């Protein structure tokens, strides 16, 4: 595990650039990224192991619930302090890209209600272009149960988010974007996710897919394999998801997945991550973090990685930027990093960019 200070020491050629001199330019020319996923507002609750056992959901799982179960959980934890943030996996990823200065947009569906308005405003606040459709259903919400070890268990009422269908996917929405990042949770609707991936590919996008959750992979194993083989260029998975997909250990899993797409990423928590493309294999160590809540860690890793990739960084640098973003978000409750933390990551991106520019000239 590396502290950020140690990280820069291990990169002396980069560290020679004075952080006070290098300035981040939001107009820097880079590829545009489009996210597609469930538009969900997260309700974050810190609970005990006993609370989680009583509810009966496996720790670390993603569980779809109906409106009745949603109301029951709300009532069960009525006295617990709640923290609301606009979330959803792909939305978190593109928000990260936008915060780091990238150009990003998000496609999802919300209700015509206060929660939906909050969601739209939050995207714009984070410099993400909202390409949102509306539904007569209530906006989707996700109750995130966070145990003392920082692990999170999702109880998701999709609501309007689940009202996004294949017929809503228009090729015009993909025009002008270079990368399309899709969350694996959409695999619950086979027609929707296949239409989205196929349309993105037809419009010339590099297609990125996050495998979402091990139980989603288990329930849709062969369908996911077919999707990846036909449409996907970049796959993100954590250790549990990669095992569900390949039944292999992480190092073997990243090799197996990379045989089916262009770039494979397997995240292994405190042990860092593996990134593979062809014969290139990189192991990126984690940075030192005081883990409070792992919500969004994988999403921010993907955001940091894709931002760096869109900026022309090599694979190791992409993994390092993803690692730093993930390492910082686990230190807070929720997924919204404070501005000073974003500034820290932006400066590192600028250092890398300045170093690459110096190498060229």
Model-derived features: where do they sit?
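Conserved phosphate-binding/catalytic loop of the ribokinase/pfkB sugar-kinase fold
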Residues: 131-134, 144-187
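Short hydrophobic targeting helices and cationic amphipathic motifs
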Residues: 7-12, 17-19
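Conserved phosphate/ATP/ADP-binding segment of small-molecule kinases
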Residues: 203-206, 211-283
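Surface-exposed amphipathic alpha-helices with a cationic face
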Residues: 98, 197-201, 258
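Substrate-binding N-lobe of the ribokinase-like
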Residues: 69-141, 348-351
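Glycine-rich phosphate/adenosyl-contacting loop at the front of the ribokinase-like
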Residues: 26-105, 361
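Conserved phosphate-binding/catalytic region of the ribokinase-like
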Residues: 31-40, 46, 53-59, 64, ...
């Amino acid at each position: 595990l590396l502290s950020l200070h140690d990280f820069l020491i291990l990169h002396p050629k980069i560290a020679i650039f004075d952080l006070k001199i290098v300035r981040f330019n939001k107009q820097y020319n880079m590829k545009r990224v489009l996210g597609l996923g469930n538009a969900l507002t997260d309700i974050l609750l810190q609970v005990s192991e006993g609370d989680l056992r009583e509810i009966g959901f496996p720790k670390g799982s993603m569980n779809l619930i109906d409106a009745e179960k949603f109301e029951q959980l709300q009532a069960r934890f009525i006295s617990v302090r709640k923290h609301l943030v606009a979330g959803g996996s792909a939305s978190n990823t593109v928000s990260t890209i936008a915060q780091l200065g990238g150009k990003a947009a998000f496609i999802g569906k919300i209700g015509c209600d206060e929660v939906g308005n909050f969601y739209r405003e939050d995207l714009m606040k984070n410099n993400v272009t909202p390409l949102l459709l509306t539904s007569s259903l209530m906006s989707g919400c996700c109750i995130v149960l966070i145990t003392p070890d920082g692990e999170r268990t999702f109880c998701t009422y999709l609501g309007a988010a689940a009202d996004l269908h294949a017929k809503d996917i228009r090729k015009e929405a993909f025009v002008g974007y270079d990368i399309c990042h899709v969350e694996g949770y959409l695999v619950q609707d086979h027609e929707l996710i296949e239409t989205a991936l196929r349309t993105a590919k037809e419009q010339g996008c590099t297609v990125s897919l996050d495998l979402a959750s091990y139980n989603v992979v288990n329930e849709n194993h062969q369908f996911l394999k077919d999707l990846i083989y036909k449409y996907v260029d970049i796959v993100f998975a954590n250790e549990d998801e990669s095992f569900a997909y390949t039944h292999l250990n992480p190092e073997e899993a990243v090799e197996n997945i990379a045989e089916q797409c262009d770039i494979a990423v397997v995240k292994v928590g405190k042990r860092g991550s593996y990134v593979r493309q062809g014969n290139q294999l990189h192991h990126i160590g984690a940075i030192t973090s005081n883990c409070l809540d792992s919500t969004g860690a994988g999403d921010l890793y993907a955001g940091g990685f894709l931002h760096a990739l869109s900026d022309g960084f090599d694979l190791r640098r992409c993994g390092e930027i993803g690692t730093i973003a993930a390492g910082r978000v686990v230190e807070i409750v929720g997924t919204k990093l404070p501005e000073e933390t974003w500034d820290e990551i932006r400066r590192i991106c600028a250092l890398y960019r300045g170093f690459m520019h110096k190498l060229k000239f």
